[in-house]
Amino acid sequence: MLMAVDIGNTQTVLGYFEGERLRASWRMTTEPYRSPDEVGAACAALFALRGLSLEDADAMIVSSVVPDLTGTYRHLAADILQVPFYAVGPEMDLGMENRYDDPSAVGADRLVNAVAARRYYGAPAIIADSGTATTVCAVDAGGAYRGGAILPGLYVSMDALASRTAKLPRVDLEEEPPRAIATNTPDSIRSGFIYGYAGAIDALIRRFKEELAAEGETEGLRVVATGGLSPVISRYCREIEVLDPDLTLKGLQVLYALNASRAR
């Protein structure tokens, strides 16, 4: 069993793989200062809820944007579970070219999404990931990671608005805005965030398509949405073709299979 871990700034997603099959997944709050024992206990409890055992893990792979927690999971794998540990980073073989100016500066989650999109949807591809940050990234027709765009996530922007204004509340974005032209303040905020972010993502995707088209890179292009907030926002996006909430976990499994086989 492979334990795949996607550590984000707000949430950590765990995946349990049998071969290429994602058997179960869980989300928990990212808490950077928890000890390996505490993290292990939390993971074990989540596994047990599905009738699974953490001790069945025979390897762990981690994608992390929180460096402190990378070390925590490394310790959990090596010293407690005593299984091989893989961390997505500059030294890992991605099986694809990384054409970022500084390849080591790309967020691990962005690379993992690119790997998964190419594997499951082909190249070229555009990936929109809606989480703590919203990212839109491109894979060209040759299968290379080309880079992308980053903007604040929905709730990061919501927190900024609520904290910097006296009369604009934090609202639940899971509730659908009835119309773009809203007639009360909560719905006006929902309209601005939902339709505004959907429009921003669509605009970026269209610009990506234009730039890739100028290089003859758009034949067969797919546009994929993922991330914890993707179910909220993607249905309002006109450019999104596929919603795959498990894309990052699937990319981790692809990278594990590639790197574990070469380590043997």
From Swiss-Prot:
Binding positions (ATP): 6-13, 132
Annotated substrate binding sites: 100, 107-110, 185
Chief place of localization: cytoplasm
Cofactor: NH4(+); K(+)
Binding residue positions for K(+): 129
Role: Catalyzes the phosphorylation of pantothenate (Pan), the first step in CoA biosynthesis.
Species for this entry: Rubrobacter xylanophilus (strain DSM 9941 / JCM 11954 / NBRC 16129 / PRD-1)
Cofactor descriptive note: A monovalent cation. Ammonium or potassium.
Enzyme Commission number(s) from the entry: 2.7.1.33
Biological pathway: Cofactor biosynthesis; coenzyme A biosynthesis; CoA from (R)-pantothenate: step 1/5
UniProt keyword list: ATP-binding, Coenzyme A biosynthesis, Cytoplasm, Kinase, Metal-binding, Nucleotide-binding, Potassium, Transferase
CDD domains named among the record's database cross-references: ASKHA_NBD_PanK-III
Identification of the protein by name: Type III pantothenate kinase
Oligomeric form and interacting partners: Homodimer.
Gene Ontology molecular function terms on file: ATP binding; metal ion binding; pantothenate kinase activity
Catalytic site: 109
Record field: catalytic activity: (R)-pantothenate + ATP = (R)-4'-phosphopantothenate + ADP + H(+)
Family: Belongs to the type III pantothenate kinase family.
NCBIfam families named in the record: baf (TIGR00671), PRK13321.1 (NF009855)
Subcellular location: Cytoplasm
GO biological process, one term: coenzyme A biosynthetic process
Keyword Oxidoreductase: no
SUPFAM superfamilies the UniProt entry points to: Actin-like ATPase domain (SSF53067)
GO terms under cellular component: cytoplasm
